[in-house]
Amino acid sequence: HTPSAEMNLEGNVRIGTHYMDKHFTPDAFDFKGKYNTADYYLSITPFSWVELAYTCTLQKMHRRDNQGNIISDEGRYYYQDRYFSIKIRPLKEGKWWPAIAVGANDPLGTLGDKGTSHDNMTPTNGDGKSEYFCNYYIAATKHFAFKVGELGVHAAYRNWKRDYNSKWNGVVGGITYSPSFARNLRTIAEYTGNEVNIGADCLLWKHLLIQASLQECRYFSGGI
């Protein structure tokens, strides 16, 4: 949930999906109240210093026709919120200094300032609160090797575009730990600016990454 300066290996391509508890998503991501959802994504690292991703998050709301008229009052996952992400690492981690990265999620936003349509038109998604995940950040990461494992320290300054995400603005960060007896396992603790989350991920057979987390140390989200 919080950014870091870590990058995937050059040439890596990742596809995955996650279940997300409603406490994980922005407060404005709602339909008659907040709801659990899921996303799926594609991530590529064409060079060691840049990472690109495309994410789709299932969105529950009224079904509408091409003119924006409601044709079904029942709320289902008829729509998806889509956005691009980019991370650039101008400084690689060294022995005495951290890696530094800058990045953004949904930097292009929408065509209009009222939703997912042109200005002065009715938003096609009907809520006028899009750009749910739009944020910008600068992050630093440093790893420390010990006999018992590797400790990662991550810090970032992040700014969200929408006011309803302001609780996550400012300084955020976390720590990661990989034990020496299981280098493919990593435990995580982070502060998002508003809550503390814990989690873990595990790489199996060099290709399958399993991830799990507890938002506010209580609410489960996870995926591959």
Residue ranges of predicted features:
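Transmembrane beta-barrel domains of Gram-negative outer membranes and organellar outer membranes
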Residues: 1-136, 141-147, 159, 179-185, ...
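Beta-strand-turn-beta hairpins that frame and shape the catalytic cleft
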Residues: 149-151, 204
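Glycine-rich phosphate-binding "P-loop"
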Residues: 152-173, 181
